[in-house]
C-alpha cells in the first residue's frame, strides 16, 4: 500500500502548479488597456445626430424643394404616401383577381371554340364522303357535276320573234328586270293588189309610161281609179253573214258599172 505521506505530497505539488497557471492568465488580462466609459449624455447625443441625418435623407427623398424640413412634416408626408401606396396595392390585388377570372373564362371559351371547330370539321368530312359515295353510285350525279355550267347571255335587244297575224299590225314589248328600253316593232300589212276586172284598162296603163318617153300631141284624160271597200279591207277582218253577202256582191257590181261608165265618158 502507498503511504499517506506520499499522497499528501503529490496533492500539495499539484495544487502549486494550478496556482501558477491561474496567475499567468490574470497577468495577461491586466496587460490590456481598459476602454473609456462613455457618458450617458454623449450616447443620447449620438443617437439624436443619427436620427437627424436619417430624417434629412428621408425629406430629401420625398420633396427636395420643401421649405419646412421638420420631423413632424416629414413623418406626416411619409404616412400619407404609405397610405396611398397601400390603397394602390389593394386595388391592384383586386384587379389581378378579376383579370385571373377573365383569363380563366377566356380559356374556357377558347376550348369550347376548339371543340366546335373539330366537330364542324368532322361533319364536313362526313358530308364529303357521303357526296363522294353518291357520285360513285349514281353516274348522273357525276355527269352533272363534271359538266361545266352553261352561261346564258342576256339578249342585247328586247324583241322576240312573234308569229304575226295576217294583215294586222303587231306590237311586241319586252321589259326585263334590268329595265331595258322598250322597243316597239310594227309590221304593216302589204297593200292589197287591185282587182283587174278590165284587162283593157291594164294594157292601156302599161302603154302610158312608154308614151311618156316620146312627145305626143294627143293628150288623153286620166281615168280615175277608186278601189272598192272589199279590195282594201282584208277578207277575214269582218265576218260576212249569208244574208249580206248578196248585197255586197250587188254593190260590188254596181260600183264596177259606175267605174266603167265614168271611164267611157
Swiss-Prot record:
InterPro entries: bHLH_dom (IPR011598), HLH_DNA-bd_sf (IPR036638). It is found in: Nucleus. Transcription factor that plays a positive role in salt stress tolerance. Interacts with TIFY11A/JAZ9 and binds to the promoter of some potassium ion transporter genes to regulate potassium homeostasis during salt stress. Residues 49-85 are annotated as: Helix-loop-helix motif. GO terms for cellular component: nucleus. GO terms for biological process: regulation of DNA-templated transcription. Keywords: Coiled coil, DNA-binding, Nucleus, Stress response, Transcription, Transcription regulation. Residues 35-85 form the bHLH domain. Residues 1-26, 200-265 are annotated as: Disordered. Residues 35-48 are annotated as: Basic motif. Residues 210-220 have a biased composition (Basic and acidic residues). One of its GO terms (molecular function) is protein dimerization activity. The gene is BHLH062. This is Transcription factor BHLH062. It comes from the Eukaryota. Interacts with TIFY11A/JAZ9.
Amino acid at each position: 500500500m502507498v503511504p499517506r505521506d506520499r499522497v499528501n505530497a503529490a496533492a500539495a505539488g499539484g495544487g502549486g502548479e494550478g496556482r501558477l497557471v491561474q496567475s499567468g492568465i490574470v497577468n495577461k488580462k491586466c496587460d490590456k488597456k481598459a476602454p473609456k466609459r462613455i457618458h450617458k449624455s454623449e450616447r443620447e447625443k449620438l443617437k439624436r445626430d443619427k436620427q437627424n441625418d436619417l430624417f434629412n435623407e428621408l425629406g430629401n427623398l420625398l420633396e427636395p424643394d420643401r421649405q419646412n424640413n421638420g420631423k413632424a412634416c416629414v413623418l406626416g408626408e411619409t404616412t400619407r404616401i404609405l397610405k396611398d401606396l397601400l390603397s394602390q396595392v389593394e386595388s391592384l390585388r383586386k384587379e389581378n383577381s378579376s383579370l385571373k377570372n377573365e383569363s380563366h373564362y377566356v380559356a374556357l371559351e377558347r376550348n369550347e371554340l376548339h371543340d366546335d371547330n373539330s366537330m364542324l370539321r368532322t361533319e364536313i368530312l362526313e358530308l364529303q364522303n357521303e357526296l363522294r359515295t353518291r357520285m360513285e353510285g349514281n353516274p348522273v350525279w357525276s355527269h352533272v357535276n363534271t359538266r361545266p355550267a352553261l352561261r346564258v347571255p342576256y339578249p342585247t335587244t328586247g324583241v322576240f320573234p312573234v308569229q304575226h297575224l295576217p294583215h294586222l299590225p303587231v306590237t311586241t314589248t319586252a321589259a326585263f328586270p334590268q329595265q331595258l328600253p322598250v322597243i316597239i316593232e310594227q309590221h304593216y300589212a302589204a297593200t292589197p293588189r287591185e282587182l283587174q276586172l278590165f284587162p283593157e284598162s291594164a294594157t292601156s296603163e302599161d302603154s302610158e309610161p312608154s308614151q311618156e318617153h316620146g312627145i305626143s300631141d294627143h293628150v288623153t284624160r286620166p281615168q280615175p281609179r277608186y278601189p272598192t271597200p272589199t279590195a282594201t279591207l282584208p277578207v277575214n277582218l269582218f265576218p260576212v253573214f249569208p244574208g249580206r253577202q248578196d248585197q255586197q256582191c250587188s254593190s260590188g257590181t254596181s260600183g264596177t258599172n259606175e267605174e266603167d261608165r265614168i271611164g267611157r265618158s
